[in-house]
Amino acid sequence: MKVIRDCFGRSVRLTDERIAHILQHPELAGMEEEISRVLRAPAEVRVSRSDETVQLFYEYYAKTRVGGKWLCVVVKYPPDDAFVVTAYLTDQLKPGETLWPKK
């Protein structure tokens, strides 16, 4: 298990089970370090509209296995914990309140 300090200074757990789940997606193969990097220094962080305890960390990568895409790392922040749920590549950011960068 890895513990990553996010851009807000919070400790986020990335378990071996979650990283195995994420890397099962062929388009994310070889992007384990990018997942950590997005948490530490994202382009943008938004609150999920479907679950206020979930935040979406985004960074754009011009070269992925499927072309230029946003890498989204999904983190759940229940009381006294924080862990990566999943990560995926996407063409656009989901709507939601922007937490980072601070306006």
Residue ranges and their predicted role:
Residues 1-103:
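Ribonuclease/tRNase effector modules and their secretory precursors
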